[in-house]
Amino acid sequence: MAKEKFQRTKPHVNIGTIGHVDHGKTTLTAAITGVLAQKGLSEMKDYDNIDNAPEEKERGITINTSHVEYETENRHYAHVDCPGHADYVKNMITGAAQMDGAILVVAATDGPMPQTREHILLSRQVGVPAIVVFLNKMDMVDDEELLELVEMEVRELLSEYEFDGDNAPVVAGSALKALEEVKAGQLGEWSEKILELMAAVDEYIPTPERDTEKDFLMPIEDVFSISGRGTVVTGRIERGTLHLNDDVDIVGFKPTVTTKVTGIEMFRKEMDEAQAGDNVGVLLRGIKKDEVERGQVLAKPGSITPHTKFEAEVYALTKEEGGRHKPFFNGYRPQFYIRTTDVTGSVILPEGVEMVMPGDNVKLTVELIAPIALEEGTRFAIREGGRTVGAGVVTKIIE
């Protein structure tokens, strides 16, 4: 029989495992693939395979991340797991692996630990919509009361960071025991817990809105003028869909201007529409070449506004990662590389924070010298003389 062509009929969701070091994130990832593999919905990935995460570069920053794929009856998942805590911080801040939801792994033997809190905070800061909890290492706990206590602590922690601590699903099990069942080819009570966890993920983590359905946005990379036709801007559509004759805003640096799209071109062909991911040239009515520049964006009218001041969660690269050798202080003035351009800005550190050392992550305030199209969740790099020294994500617009 001919091999079936891969058909994406199920909705696709990106998730990841988060939690304190050694609480069993990678073991759980292996257990999920193993249990689902027995159900014919995944390929088994063993622990070492996942733990030896390949290096990736995102915005000039090296991150170790493992990606596995699997399916449930209802959905197709891409799952990310990071070996080290610093990799999580970098991953979440750069958005290297966007998460539509997360599985928080907490060892029932330990309860919430410092990185448990930090990963929940980061998830809040970078806009992860929902968290499902897996209480791991249940085979080592025989005290029912202790379990209830740990569950209560985790729920309180979720609520503290504005997740739905009261209603978040909490599943207790043992990733290691489930893996042992998988290896023995005998799915038993521990594997059932993994299936219960995945049923909770299926139900509780919302299906993300597809990029093509979001409000149109395209960062401008280049500007040309075509004699007799007008001005063309080029770039890759970040989200949404653009149609011929749509109105668009040109946002950034100068007061926002609205204009009409009189042509869309891709691979030298005229098109009626283009969507997220496409590299296109867009012809704009009545716009002169010097009225538009790299670093501005084309956007659905009214959907995004220019700002100069915002709060951000930032990771400062270590010296080994090519970052600064020394800390930076209040009033630090680097370039902020936002979408397609560098803009100078100054840094205001929170009260009580004297300086930021290479390798730290910190919440700070940025004031740019020129207004740029920004919103919560916009990612940026921090650069000095073209060299990346940090990464950040906008967490709150101030003005």
UniProtKB/Swiss-Prot annotation:
Q: Which residues form the signal peptide?
A: none
Keywords attached to this entry: Cytoplasm, Elongation factor, GTP-binding, Hydrolase, Magnesium, Metal-binding, Nucleotide-binding, Protein biosynthesis
Recorded GO terms, molecular function? Answer: GTP binding; GTPase activity; translation elongation factor activity
Region G3, annotated ranges: 81-84
Its source organism is Nautilia profundicola (strain ATCC BAA-1463 / DSM 18972 / AmH)
Q: Which cysteines are joined by disulfide bonds?
A: none
Can you say what this protein is called? Elongation factor Tu
Region spans: G4: 136-139
A GO CC term? cytosol
Chain's role: GTP hydrolase that promotes the GTP-dependent binding of aminoacyl-tRNA to the A-site of ribosomes during protein biosynthesis.
Instruction: Provide the residue positions that the database annotates as binding GTP.
Output: 19-26, 81-85, 136-139
Report whether Transmembrane helix shows up as a keyword of the record: no
Q: Where in the cell is it found?
A: Cytoplasm
- Which EC class, in a word? hydrolase
Instruction: Outline the segment boundaries, as ranges, of region: G2.
Output: 60-64
Q: Does the keyword Nucleotide-binding apply?
A: yes
Q: Where is the tr-type G domain?
A: 10-209
User: Where is the region G5?
Assistant: 174-176
